[in-house]
Amino acid sequence: MQQETTDTQEYQLAMESFLKGGGTIAMLNEISSDTLEQLYSLAFNQYQSGKYEDAHKVFQALCVLDHYDSRFFLGLGACRQAMGQYDLAIHSYSYGAIMDIKEPRFPFHAAECLLQKGELAEAESGLFLAQELIADKTEFKELSTRVSSMLEAIKLKKEMEHECVDNP
């Protein structure tokens, strides 16, 4: 019994060390990067086809298999957002943002979720961050336009709310 406990503890320590050292569950199970890419393509295509629950399952598995690939968390967040699971989507986007701090889509999509929840100040903060991350990157020109439009809409909504309070 004592030996079993010691073996389990040693295994847990070895696993923790492996994961902290950059290892993934995919590596442990010898799942190739090609296989992960095929799964990603499957999930992406399911998402694009509106099969959010199916895509969600695959993205969730991908996040477990390789918790370092931020694309998987972007996909997971997008599925959750499409299914109206805004809090869970925000969690996915937040984790992805930690993995890729220069990716403006994470704060942008989190802001969309926050807007759906009616949390204007928090959404505005996310949009400002997205705007800052976009800077003058040409590949995010369309996203930049959307961010600007959403910030303007929030500004107008705040002004309307102020007018309603000032002029009841």
From Swiss-Prot:
Give the matching InterPro entries: T3SS_Ca_resp_chp_LcrH/SycD, T3SS_Ca_resp_chp_LcrH/SycD_sub, TPR-3, TPR-like_helical_dom_sf
UniProt keyword terms in alphabetical order: Chaperone, Plasmid
Source taxon at top rank? Bacteria
Q: Which NCBIfam families match?
A: LcrH_SycD (TIGR02552)
Its function? Mediates the negative regulation of the lcrGVH operon by ATP or calcium. Acts as a modulator of the yop operon expression.
Q: Which family does it belong to?
A: Belongs to the LcrH/SycD chaperone family.
Question: Which protein is depicted?
Answer: Low calcium response locus protein H
